[in-house]
Structures are given as C-alpha cells and as structure tokens.
C-alpha cells in the first residue's frame, strides 16, 4: 500500500491505488473515476481530508457511484503531471490537492483543487447525473478538450485562452459555478 493510502486508511472512502487493474475495474463497472492527488506536506490536502473525505455522505456517494483513486504525487509524478497539465490548460492555474473526475477510460472531464464538503457533493452528484443521462456527451466533450490541449502542445501555441474559454462554456453547461 502506498504511503498516501496509508495516510487515508481510516477515512470511510474505499480508496484504490493507481493501477491498470483499478482502471480496468472502472471500465468493467462503467463508473466514473474520482482521482485525488496530493502529498504528505500539503496543507489543503489535509484540510480536504478532514473536512470532506471523512464525511459519511461524501463517502457513501463516492463508494457507491465512483471508483476512487488516491495518488501521492511524490510516488507517481507521471500521473500528477498528466492531470496537472489538464488542470492548468483548462483553468489556468493549479495546486493540490488535485481532484479530477475521469471517464471510465481515464480521460479527464473535470479538474479542480480544494473543495468544501457541500461543493464536492454537488460536483460529484452533477457529474454522476450527467453521465447517467448522456455518457456519450461527456465523452465527446472530454475528447474535444483533450484534442485542443494536444493540438496546442504540439504547435507550442500560446492560445491557452481559447481552451480556457471553451472550458468556461463547459462549466456553464454543468451549472456548477
């Protein structure tokens, strides 16, 4: 078990490790993935752990509707890098904890940092509703955002604002902010 998982072993969320087996489980169960990346010295990681991840309502939602993965960025800098890039490209800033919602295939559809308990429940509930109602729409949107990011990275474009504008339109669709 990774250090990060040991640190969170007593909270009620059934955290899994980052592995092919876990990703395959998400695909087989057709469940969205909650990916939470942090590190031991991260103040806001500890705050979110205490205020959000120990809440029974949060745990019930995450355990029943999502595959939840906890990653220590110091043990998996490669994973952190991929999803931090997504956060930076879509929001313009980053930080930890890095919390992402992924499609069952691991493609990111949302990323943020610290969330209060009520914000987290609202966000997860909204994504679960959208995925149940029209999973293909979420897949199409995720693919569009990823293609824009890849295109911009390939051409070294400075047009990050275009991705951010598209992301803001996507967030409006979610009615989260």
Regions found by a protein language model. Give the residues of each.
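Replace the tail clause
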Residues: 3-177
């Amino acid at each position: 078990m990774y250090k990060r998982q040991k640190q969170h072993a007593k909270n009620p969320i059934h955290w899994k490790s980052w592995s092919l087996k876990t990703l395959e489980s998400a695909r087989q169960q057709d469940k969205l993935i909650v990916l939470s990346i942090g590190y031991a010295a991260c103040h806001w990681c500890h705050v979110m752990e205490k205020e959000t991840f120990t809440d029974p309502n949060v745990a019930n939602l995450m355990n029943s509707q999502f595959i939840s993965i906890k990653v220590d960025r110091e043990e998996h800098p490669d994973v952190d890098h991929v999803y931090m890039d997504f956060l930076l490209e879509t929001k313009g800033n980053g930080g930890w904890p890095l919390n992402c919602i992924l499609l069952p295939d691991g493609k990111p559809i949302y990323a943020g940092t610290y969330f209060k308990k009520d914000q987290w429940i609202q966000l997860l509930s909204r994504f679960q509703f959208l995925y149940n109602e029209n999973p293909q729409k979420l897949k199409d949107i995720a693919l569009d955002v990823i293609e824009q990011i890849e295109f911009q990275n390939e051409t070294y474009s400075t047009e990050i604002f275009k991705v951010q504008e598209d992301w803001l339109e996507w967030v409006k669709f979610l009615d989260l902010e």
